[in-house]
């Protein structure tokens, strides 16, 4: 009979965006390394960690509900993440929470776990922690966070008050992590941060070192080095700064996926100014045209806000005109929602909810027509697809134009012999508003 003491269990709940997911992965990796058994439930857990989101009101509500559920089911709860920056708000509703920390407070979270759950002396799990750490994504893709915080002060956003100003990770550290992911079988890396294009600004783009070689701390240099690893490299949260133009040739040459996620937010100069967002419509359209001339295969994704305080019908029409002219491939749209602490809340002339809804519907109808046009042009074309899921009906994957969770899918009906992580060549047979259907090419 074994007298090995069972590892203490820590429950874990992760909410919010991919950047928060990466924070969760880091905490989980350390907990596993120290010998804790991390479980996705409250049953038998000696304490529960809830990594929260606090960006918009609906996310705050979801986080508060998750904390409440953990308290009801378990009773011992440690809170971290963006909402943790608003400790008073949490304590007011959930006074029995044990400890609260803000975002990326990894060491503090671990210290709190040690306080309430004895640190294992015998560690049966250390040898089971993979070199790339614990990942919450499927094995074939992973998020690579290159910085924390943001230097922008957009009036609708409170991220800087939660996560602070931009702090870039050392480029050698980022590239070493990417290499470990490659060695673990990852086929696609999704580069994320609050502002990927600002990578290195805080350290004046100083030279770092990777494998003994000097590398400049910049987005372009990072992309050039990541390209050497031979994975799909997808760029998210890229502001339209001039130096972004330097990445487009890398996309044309197949070194980085021809995909840019650029949160433009609006097209009216006045609304953009009220939002404290960079860029002008004319210049943005010019650059999009230039990018497409250099790299015809480029996929452009963006997000927009409708119903921002003071938005007139004329200004909303400017946004619709931009959507029609720009023909962006993938678009997300949000109705403006006041976020506690955001400067935009102080702006006059809030747009009534029914007007917001009506504009949202008009926006999405137009974008759907754009998407139908764009995807119809892909029928008959050949492309590579990365398989995400396989079931009894067939396989589902994504092309270079599709990021996980937010973009379209490629369906391969009847292809049950494939497995997640397979990279296959297909011919597109059909298209609808957002997705494609394809056949394997032998």
Swiss-Prot record:
Its cofactor is [4Fe-4S] cluster. InterPro entries: Elp3/MiaA/NifB-like_rSAM (IPR006638), Methylthiotransferase (IPR005839), Methylthiotransferase_CS (IPR020612), Methylthiotransferase_N (IPR013848), Methylthiotransferase_N_sf (IPR038135), NA-bd_OB-fold (IPR012340), Ribosomal_uS12_MeSTrfase_RimO (IPR005840), rSAM (IPR007197). Residues 8-118 form the MTTase N-terminal domain. The keyword Cytoplasm applies. It is an enzyme of class 2 (transferase). Residues 136-373 form the Radical SAM core domain. GO terms for molecular function: 4 iron, 4 sulfur cluster binding; aspartic acid methylthiotransferase activity; metal ion binding; protein methylthiotransferase activity. It is found in: Cytoplasm. Transmembrane segments: none annotated. Keywords: 4Fe-4S, Cytoplasm, Iron, Iron-sulfur, Metal-binding, S-adenosyl-L-methionine, Transferase. [4Fe-4S] cluster 1 binds at residues 17, 53, 82. It catalyses: L-aspartate(89)-[ribosomal protein uS12]-hydrogen + (sulfur carrier)-SH + AH2 + 2 S-adenosyl-L-methionine = 3-methylsulfanyl-L-aspartate(89)-[ribosomal protein uS12]-hydrogen + (sulfur carrier)-H + 5'-deoxyadenosine + L-methionine + A + S-adenosyl-L-homocysteine + 2 H(+). GO terms for biological process: tRNA modification. The keyword Repressor does not apply. It holds the Pfam family Radical_SAM. [4Fe-4S] cluster 2 binds at residues 150, 154, 157. Residues 376-442 form the TRAM domain. Its EC number is 2.8.4.4. Binds 2 [4Fe-4S] clusters. One cluster is coordinated with 3 cysteines and an exchangeable S-adenosyl-L-methionine. One of its GO terms (cellular component) is cytosol. Belongs to the methylthiotransferase family. RimO subfamily. Catalyzes the methylthiolation of an aspartic acid residue of ribosomal protein uS12. PANTHER family: RIBOSOMAL PROTEIN S12 METHYLTHIOTRANSFERASE RIMO, RIBOSOMAL PROTEIN US12 METHYLTHIOTRANSFERASE RIMO. This is Ribosomal protein uS12 methylthiotransferase RimO. It comes from Aeromonas hydrophila subsp. hydrophila (strain ATCC 7966 / DSM 30187 / BCRC 13018 / CCUG 14551 / JCM 1027 / KCTC 2358 / NCIMB 9240 / NCTC 8049). The gene is rimO.
